[in-house]
């Protein structure tokens, strides 16, 4: 290399490598070489780099001209090694142009007479082209040979590329464990060279491998790491954004995935990538938007992908895009015989590279054919889908196979086989959920079982017994409470980040705080999402109906389920018997709930006269809400306490405000299984009490002060002493705890719902650090009982995590309430708890003791949750 023939920062022989990590810089430097007095060898490097940049931007014609010009220069000056290298580059460009035969001819020419090390570097690139054309065995052979030669020649950079290609081929062949080992070795090699860009590519590939192995926490951790590395390098390839969106979707993080998909579309619209890369990216974004409930956006993106693929002759990619268009159209209501036949035809045409997409197409064809009377086509499509995927592939693919089996059985009128297939599919998803160490992921992952659960529940609601309906409702409800809780462990990194979050939260008035808070929250979520399960794997706790009926005693349990586009169905368990009752229209409930909460919110903080007017105006709406949710169930309630198990979307109903429930002992539970666990749990032998007053709560001093006089041995934290760490220490293992603090419900991010303490917010993530949760906990914070519905029928929030951790009884509110009124209520509740009442009975006493309208509104806004 001659000085002066390159830019001041880059030598000519470094330009081809720079073309991948910094294409703009490489292009500028290459043009500077070509416009100056370059030596022939430097000219070949510059032309090769320019060709790589043009290739990656999708400018295939220009790339071919640049590389061929480099070959001519090399031949004219007898630069044999450079010609070999450039012919390999030519083969890669020709492959991207879809010209398979000329591409392999270029590689044959490059290999002819090449020295061993040169030959190995050519084989690395030919392996990549073999992979591109789905010749996985060819890619494996070339990569294996190249890796062995390059190891002998002590060339770690190229050996890393060879092993990365080998891993990709093994991944495509389904040999995941071998692929993972090769990727790990490739990363080790490339890290030793200091090539940060290539190292980042391998981290990304390891994330894709982990995803295919079904290890979503590890996949998220690796892809988040890859994205961070790319950001530091200032280069964000669309592939990493695509992979992250796909894995976020698989993890149930639909909103996150939709945001990532929008970023992907923006990257693709602003980039000049190859048609295939653009097509793959647009398809991924379309699938995410389809899952996020935006079929119109999904269809537009999929059509864009289809056009791009068609122009370049990428048939499989075009077929895949057309499948997504059909799925989006079906979601939007286009259910016709033409659509069914089109889906079946596309499924038949997709190659093995698109096996997962073929499964989706088969299930779609089966559903559409069944709905439009094409029973023979439906049976054929569903049989193929069920046979191919029930026992292999990722958990989500296996569950889809069982869904196909269930649809097949339903179309054949085999009720028993249909329910069995639904159960097997949900079993697969339980195992999948157990692999996730983050509770948020466990809750959100249940969305993948929604179709299975809905299919079975709809059927038993029509022709099943009350016992069947209860069992199937419990089968997919309250998963966080039915699966073993991830073992608590010390996590220094998480603790430090939560401390930083509190520090930022306490800096009131700083304009920079909000952006910093968002950054810290994102780091926390990414860290927790990458957490893997610690400890032995066990199974889901199943409901024992006999045990439930025995435990109820004189109580009545009402399990409510809302069917899509239908009515609320309830199973009433009382006196050792079960009864199925049909209530009101499920579509009418949400508006009534919001109106009821609006009225209570106003009345709970108003003067008594105004509160009375607001409550009187709310009465007709509360009566309508009762009729919608319960209807004839009211006549089945008996005289004893009532346990309500509503859908997650109805957990925040102010149940104590409903006319038939105001004068009853009422508790609410996320599932019958959760209530039974709470009811039969053993209180701690050490009856320790924790009393905690939060920050900036004018009435909390009086409340906690009075309670401290009642519980003379309690741990009392007020003022600056009420820090997060001190509160957690006091809560851990306590028999009874009371926190009077302002609460903040985060609908945008429920795991950051919090209680305001002296040093900042105590979040759900903090609560999950408890080794042993309090047996009973009273939360007088505003909206402390509100959670975010997610997944199939789950809630995320403060009370959900506490009850899933093992807290047997909780008192919380569903709307903001008056601090002063909640103090009076708290004192009544504590008085009754000390006499031996459970929380439901204690809250009933508080409702009865409420003298004025504002006090009644406050009492109606509280829920007793759990079973103690």
Predicted regions and their residues:
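Structural signature of alpha-solenoid helical repeat junctions
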Residues: 6, 42, 82, 118, ...
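Cysteine protease catalytic core and zymogen-processing segment of caspase-like enzymes
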Residues: 660-675, 744-808, 825
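Single-residue signature of alpha-solenoid repeat helices
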Residues: 26, 63, 103, 139, ...
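Residue register of alpha-helical TPR repeats
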Residues: 9, 45, 85, 121, ...
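Amphipathic alpha-helical protein-protein interaction segments
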Residues: 2, 415-663, 682-690
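Amphipathic alpha-helical segments of tetratricopeptide repeats
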Residues: 31-35, 71-75, 108-113, 144-154, ...
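Catalytic-core domains of enzymes
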Residues: 579-581, 588-599, 643-736, 755
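Caspase-like cysteine protease fold
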Residues: 745, 750-773, 819-868
